[in-house]
Amino acid sequence: MLIRFKGAHIVDPGNINEQKDLLVKDGLVHALLDPGAADPEPGIDTVDVTGMLLVPGLIDLHVHLREPGHEYKETIQTGLMAAAKGGFTAVCPMPNTSPVNDNAQVTRFILDRAKAAGLSRVYPVGAITLGLKGETLAEYGEMKQAGMVAITDDGRPVENARVMRRAMEYATGLGLPVMSHSEDLSLARDGAMNEGSFATRIGIKGIPNAAESIMVMREIAIAELTHARVHIAHVSCEESVDAIRHGKQRGVQVTCETAPHYFTLTDKAVGDYDTHAKMNPPLRSEADRLAVIKGLQDGTIDCIATDHAPHSPLEKAVEFDQAAFGIIGLETSLVLSLKLVQDELLSMETLVEKMSRNPARFLGLDNRLIPGNPADITVIDPDRVHVIDPETFVSKSRNTPFAGIEVKGEVLLTMVEGRIIYQREI
């Protein structure tokens, strides 16, 4: 099958940033053609994407698909539907399922479900420790053979530094990166939002920046000691950005991600105890928000992920202290991130680096739009203005703090290996 994407501005960092036509054949990028060039062979289906942006498929390094065990929140099928609608051609599900993804059997189950869904690619992340208990290391070798790509105890920190050292040593021997949920529970325990004047005024126990940054510094130090690759998840505060910047300057193999809510909102979004603005780490101060943007600008922050964390209404419609941490993000991440481009804080090329190229590098993938590579593509309508409406989500859950916000830009089409897995109704 031959498909010609006609009229788009292609943004592929380090490769192309201009108007070209893209030809897809048998699931692969076949050729880049000048606008107006004749079809190189007969039987080509043309998709007119004039005025649109065409980029390598977006990749989300941090999602919670909830299956197995919590299918009332999300399933692999519905999570991948949300990913496709959000422009993501690949996602990395975290291991905090039930049972935990701490063995090859669960890894294979996730991959089998993903294959049956036939949507975005799935690269499972396995647990650092059995049962996420922070004690006994999981069997990384067997999980890697089954298809696991990295390890983390996300949702919980590995509190014991010796266990984390052993994990990094073991992972390094297998060529696996270690993703860190950086949280000092002795500082964060019982907290529900950012520690600051606003939390004091509304009477909510706070979580200080130090609860995150202390553990970020520890992980960087252990990675330096063990020569491991460490990836800091969901960076939210200025001190963490500074620590990662200094670690990179020392040559430590540290990468990191943030999420759109950390450069879009502050702790003021909690407002009148809005549990949809409760996540971990929490929304921080304006100074932290600006520090995260600076980290994206100067390359300290490598990736934008979602930390897509679905919850049922019953888990959010309770007192703020008792509500579950987490928000969904697969269907809103791109449109919120495009605001950075619209406000001239990032170039479109840099945004694609954060949401596609750098996540691909983390996974050891080459997702450039060059002949012979898989045709994993996201087409974006940069001008469509709309209001975020959770009732239109295809995710099972609706827990977002962005309901009612007007945004500019929307995914028009998502393609994986030459198959259109999502196309916006016009």
UniProtKB/Swiss-Prot annotation:
Q: What is the lineage of its organism?
A: Bacteria, Pseudomonadati, Thermodesulfobacteriota, Desulfobacteria, Desulfobacterales
Q: Spell out the reaction equation it catalyses.
A: (S)-dihydroorotate + H2O = N-carbamoyl-L-aspartate + H(+)
* Any GO MF annotation of the entry: zinc ion binding
Entry binding sites for Zn(2+) 2: D154, H181, H234
Root EC class: hydrolase
User: Do you know which PROSITE patterns this protein is assigned to?
Assistant: DIHYDROOROTASE_1 (PS00482), DIHYDROOROTASE_2 (PS00483)
Ligand binding (substrate): H64, L65, R66, N96, N280, H311, F325, G326
Record's keyword annotation contains Metal-binding: yes
Q: In which pathway does it act?
A: Pyrimidine metabolism; UMP biosynthesis via de novo pathway; (S)-dihydroorotate from bicarbonate: step 3/3
Instruction: List the catalytic residues.
Output: D307
> What EC identifiers does the entry list?
3.5.2.3
Required co-factor(s) are:
Zn(2+)
Q: How is the cofactor bound?
A: Binds 2 Zn(2+) ions per subunit.
Protein's UniProt name: Dihydroorotase
The record's section on InterPro entries has: Amidohydro-rel (IPR006680), DHOase (IPR004722), DHOase/Allantoinase_Hydrolase (IPR050138), Dihydroorotase_CS (IPR002195), Metal-dep_hydrolase_composite (IPR011059), Metal_Hydrolase (IPR032466)
GO BP terms, alphabetized: 'de novo' UMP biosynthetic process; purine nucleobase catabolic process
Q: Which Gene3D superfamilies match?
A: Metal-dependent hydrolases (3.20.20.140), Urease, subunit C, domain 1 (2.30.40.10)
